[in-house]
């Protein structure tokens, strides 16, 4: 389970993993109040990518990344629905 040290590396790898097979990828966010750590995990059951942080500024990056993935998911779904109706 590779744990990334920089956000840029993690976000690129996670997006590639999602684009490879969108139906199998899951995203898990976990916050531990005791440690003050936020962990984001992206997995497709074969590859598991992990990024941990205790910095408040990284929360905004994670939020932006999460919304970017949601946009990709919606774009794929709307394309599939249009193709099915034709």
From Swiss-Prot:
It comes from Mus musculus (Mouse). GO terms for biological process: negative regulation of translational elongation; SRP-dependent cotranslational protein targeting to membrane. Coiled coil: none annotated. The keyword RNA-binding applies. One of its GO terms (molecular function) is 7S RNA binding. Pfam families: SRP9-21. PANTHER family: SIGNAL RECOGNITION PARTICLE 9 KDA PROTEIN (PTHR12834:SF12). One of its GO terms (cellular component) is signal recognition particle, endoplasmic reticulum targeting. This is Signal recognition particle 9 kDa protein. Its main location: cytoplasm. Heterodimer with SRP14; binds RNA as heterodimer. Component of a signal recognition particle complex that consists of a 7SL RNA molecule of 300 nucleotides and six protein subunits: SRP72, SRP68, SRP54, SRP19, SRP14 and SRP9. InterPro entries: Signal_recog_particle_SRP9/14, SRP9, SRP9-like, SRP9_dom. Component of the signal recognition particle (SRP) complex, a ribonucleoprotein complex that mediates the cotranslational targeting of secretory and membrane proteins to the endoplasmic reticulum (ER). SRP9 together with SRP14 and the Alu portion of the SRP RNA, constitutes the elongation arrest domain of SRP. The complex of SRP9 and SRP14 is required for SRP RNA binding. Belongs to the SRP9 family. Keywords: Cytoplasm, Ribonucleoprotein, RNA-binding, Signal recognition particle. It is found in: Cytoplasm.
């Amino acid at each position: 389970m590779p744990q990334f040290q920089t956000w840029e590396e993690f976000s690129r790898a996670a997006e590639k993993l999602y684009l490879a097979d969108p139906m199998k990828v899951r995203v898990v966010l976990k916050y531990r109040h005791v440690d003050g750590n936020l962990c984001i995990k992206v997995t497709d059951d074969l590859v598991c990518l992990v990024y941990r942080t205790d910095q408040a500024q990284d929360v905004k990056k994670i939020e932006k990344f999460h919304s970017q993935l949601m946009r990709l998911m919606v774009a794929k779904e709307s394309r599939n629905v249009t193709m099915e109706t034709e």
